[in-house]
Amino acid sequence: IIALSVFVTELLSQMTLEEKIGQLNLPVVTSEIVTGETLSGNVVSLIRAGQAGAVFNAAGYETVYGLQKIAVEESRLGIPLLFGLDVIHGYKTCYPVPLGLASSWNMPLVEKVGRISAIEASADGINWLYGPMLDISRDPRWGRCVESPGEDAFLNGAYGTAMVKGIQGELRSDSEILSCVKHFALYGASESGMDYRETDMSPERMYNVYLEAYWEAIQAGAASVMASFNDINGTPASADEWLLNEVLRNQWGFDGFVVSDYNAIREMSVHGLGDASEVSKRAITA
């Protein structure tokens, strides 16, 4: 049996630069996404060429397993894909929205919802759930309050811990899949409750209120984190080295991976932070 670290090192040594960059690519398989542009190229061609490391929004056994078969059997190195999906309040079985579920204060029930959601999603080949969403939301004008456990830092932290444990378990079986804590950070505190807007906040308020729930989910073992759309004190979260490196990795000890939210890297360019090369560099080095 080859040690995982040895296997990964050997695999990396075989990869071209294009294939390594391709592992950072997360194409979408449907045009039914309303946030920004969707992929214009052929997803199957990208997978065959080793130009995709994960796929977003693939749903259904036939689609997921068909794409995974192409990745494993037809790409040069046969690296399997991650399949990410937003599962807000259940995959096949529909549960109360997070705001309602959290209001029960029943954390064993929250964990069970996460467990069943993971079991159902994994049966279709999904191995990466985009949740829990732990944005403190105190402005009712913000349109995504319903996805959050609410306004209380303690409750959000307890909810996040339970959901991470439910989704991931011990990550030892096919039905124990990756969670993704989002949206890091302060997404629910955007100016005037307007989505994507800037967030102006002191470090004291961040640490005492808004960062607590994310931290608790990380301590519970969350495997991945999604950076938020908003900027924080003038810096977009997706390119915020202080947030993603100093806080998340150095202070909190997070050793998983970070994913940008939908189209967030391209949007940094649209918002004037530089061309595609510049904003990509800022995101990767953050």
Language-model features, listed with the residues they occupy:
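Glycoside hydrolase catalytic-domain context in secreted enzymes
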Residues: 1-286
